Design a protein with these regions (language model features):
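A short, active-site helix/loop in glycosyltransferases that binds the activated sugar's phosphate group
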Residues: 154-181, 188-190
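Short hydrophobic beta-strand element within catalytic cores of glycosyltransferases
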Residues: 285, 304, 308-311
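An aromatic- and histidine-rich active-site surface loop
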Residues: 85-98, 102-129, 133, 294
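Conserved donor-binding/catalytic core segment of Leloir-type glycosyltransferases
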Residues: 19-21, 202-235, 241
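Nucleotide-activated donor-binding/catalytic signature segment of Leloir-type glycosyltransferases, i.e.
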Residues: 253-274
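Aromatic "clamp/platform" in nucleotide-sugar-dependent glycosyltransferases that forms part
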Residues: 290-291
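Membrane-proximal helix-turn-helix segments that form the acceptor-binding/catalytic region
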Residues: 97, 143-160
Length: 394
């Protein structure tokens, strides 16, 4: 079956007018939604679609710009504390209520406002972004609100998008009468054959393939304390390097910093892509503790680098890493896995590395993700002109 992108231009369905909301903007400089919005929107624009990505501004009137063929439309984000994100999302939804064939909202915090485009006949998709309400950073009222918005999203949206099949299955099970849900994964950039420059390792006093690394935000659901405990039980000589902004401003971060030593090293956030690729690529193994959410970008990037992955045992991580990772549920299990990594590293590293890269190249390339989105968008907006969906399309 041919992809939409492979159809002769003269025979392709007419281009779509697509709005992407819910990110801080592009080019990406913050997190997963921003990277997703950039990678998807640029590729859709290259295929002839008129794509608009909404971006936040601290000013009331900022003219639109164009970034690699994508219109960037700015809306003010007020300084209202936690409510500022909601106000920004609502402003974007109000502006996008007409003039588009499809509005794609990243996140469901403003799900109730998705009715504004819908009442004017515009389909609205909502990316459900994992179990956002379960994240420890939210207080009780915020969690209750987000749980309510998850429910609202199931009938405010025309379609729900999940970046993990486990999330899509949960939506169908918990909200059987809600909007249809589709699984389209997050993407990653496969590593080139060129070996990254290892000179940056000296910045952190590291030697290639003689350290273990974690890249994560310091939040309880990412299991950093359990990873540190398991590492200490392991008792090996390779240091544990934790990449993330652990500044000690929260009680959890203060607990983490109590374990700082020559063996447990907190190097702060690394935002330069080349430096981050370096510290990942030359790690003996990558420890992944994330447990809330769907397809995790950090896990995909580690696999794209060819890391030997040891991941927290949950459906989301198993769905992504499959047989290219080892899994742990307790600190003692992690210690056992790390003993195996050290003992078998020279024997199995090349094979494990290639398996991880193969999974990314087969299932998680941005071009493949864009193919899936484009086919589903045409099925939604131009059903009479759309090519057939893949057999597993929903």
């Amino acid at each position: 079956m041919r992809r939409v992108s492979e159809i002769t231009p003269a025979l392709r369905p007419t281009p779509l007018r697509i709005a992407v909301l819910g990110a801080k903007g592009i080019p990406a400089s913050y997190g997963g939604f921003e990277t997703f919005a950039e990678k998807l929107s640029i590729r859709l624009a290259q295929r002839g679609h008129a794509v608009t990505v909404y971006a936040e501004s601290d000013q009331a009137a900022v003219p639109d710009t164009v970034y690699q063929g994508v219109r960037v439309r700015y809306r003010r984000r007020p300084s209202w504390g936690p409510a500022s994100v909601l106000a920004y999302d609502c402003a974007c939804l109000w502006d996008a209520r007409q003039g588009y064939d499809l509005v794609y909202m990243l996140g469901y915090g403003a799900a109730w406002a998705c009715w504004w485009p819908r009442v004017l006949g515009t389909p609205v998709w909502i990316n459900m972004d994992g179990l956002e309400w379960a994240r420890s950073k939210w207080g009780r009222l915020a969690r209750a609100y987000l749980r309510c918005m998850e429910w609202v999203a199931t009938f405010a949206a025309t379609r729900l998008i999940a970046d993990a099949e486990a999330i899509a299955q949960r939506l169908r099970r918990v909200y059987p009468g809600g909007a249809p849900s589709s699984f389209i994964a997050y993407g990653a950039e496969p590593m080139t054959e060129e070996v990254p420059d290892s000179s940056a390792l000296a910045t952190w006093g590291l030697q290639a393939y003689q350290y273990m690394v974690v890249v994560a935000r310091p939040e309880p659901e990412n299991h950093l304390l359990e990873i540190i405990e398991g590492y200490r039980l392991h008792g090996g000589v390779w240091p544990l390097v934790i990449v993330g902004d652990v500044s000690g401003v929260t009680p959890y971060q203060k607990r983490l910093l109590r374990h700082a030593s020559d063996r447990v090293r907190f190097v702060g956030g690394i935002y330069d892509p080349q430096q981050l690729a370096c510290i990942r690529s030359f790690a003996a193994c990558y420890l992944h503790g994330h447990s809330v959410g769907g397809t995790n970008p950090s896990l995909l990037e580690a696999m794209a680098c060819g890391n030997w992955v040891v991941a927290h045992d949950n459906p989301f991580n198993r769905e992504v890493a499959r047989d290219a990772a080892d899994y742990f549920g307790t600190p003692q299990e992690l210690a056992n896995r790390l003993d195996q990594v050290v003992g078998q590293w020279h024997q199995w590293h090349t094979e494990r590395s290639q398996r991880a890269r193969d999974i990314v190249a087969t299932h998680y390339t941005w071009d493949g993700i864009t193919d899936a989105y484009e086919a589903l968008m045409y099925a939604q907006c131009r059903p009479s002109m759309a090519p057939p969906l893949p057999a597993d399309g929903r």
